[in-house]
């Protein structure tokens, strides 16, 4: 078997995350696209940490002939909130992502409206704006600088993920991240403090929203 889908098959949703704990949450959070299930399928890809790892993983996942060649892509997992008042467990839906290089272009997320509505309808605290990329863990004064430059949150993989997805062909892209630490709630290590546990629970709860978004992309009136 080559793994190549039939030409008339709808592509599965590709959810990209960096960490094993993120992949665990996203795979445990709802229907996983198992054989025999109705509805669109989902592939959860662990890219590894950092922008270079994300770019490599996406290039391989979206290569010609792969099952996910034409897939819409969501970058998900945890992030650091930059705005005062953000708390662990808040959700960030990117209006655009921008890489860590000074002249990096923005990747707009034009299909994020249904995600915003569905997450808010679930009673989650949702922030929307620029999701900035970094190649290292951002703390202290650097966070304040990124926020002053217009970003609402930062992580290491979303911008690289969506940039690689768009480079591989036109497709819907989105970035949905859960705040694991924020200016007033800095996290020392994921899973060891209350904020990390709260963020994990929220991340686990958002997968049904991703399914709904994927289904909306398949509607004939789009």
Task: Identify what each model region corresponds to.
Residues 2-11, 67:
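Extreme N-terminus of proteins, especially the signal/transit-peptide cleavage junction
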Residues 15-16, 77:
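Intrinsically disordered, low-complexity regions
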Residues 24-222:
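Glycine-rich phosphate- or other oxyanion-binding loops that anchor nucleotides, phosphorylated ligands
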């Amino acid at each position: 078997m080559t793994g190549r889908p039939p030409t008339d098959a709808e592509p599965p949703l590709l959810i990209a995350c960096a960490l094993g704990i993120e992949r665990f949450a996203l795979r445990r959070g709802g229907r996983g696209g198992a054989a025999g299930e109705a509805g669109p399928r989902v592939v959860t890809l662990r890219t590894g940490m950092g922008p270079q790892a994300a770019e490599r993983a996406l290039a391989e996942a979206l290569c010609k002939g792969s099952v996910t060649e034409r897939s819409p892509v969501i970058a998900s997992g945890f992030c650091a909130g930059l705005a005062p008042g953000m708390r662990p467990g808040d959700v960030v839906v990117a209006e655009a992502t921008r890489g860590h290089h000074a002249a990096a272009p923005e990747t707009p997320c034009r299909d994020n409206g249904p995600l915003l509505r569905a997450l808010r309808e679930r009673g989650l605290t949702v922030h929307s704006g620029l999701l900035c990329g970094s190649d290292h863990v951002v703390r202290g004064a650097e966070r304040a600088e990124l926020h002053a430059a217009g970003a609402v949150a930062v992580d290491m993989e979303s911008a690289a993920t969506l940039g690689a997805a768009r480079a591989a062909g036109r497709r819907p892209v989105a970035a949905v991240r859960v705040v694991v630490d924020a200016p007033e709630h800095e996290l020392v290590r994921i899973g060891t403090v209350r904020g990390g546990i709260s963020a994990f629970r929220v991340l686990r709860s958002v997968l049904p929203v991703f399914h709904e978004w994927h289904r909306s992309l398949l509607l004939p009136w789009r």
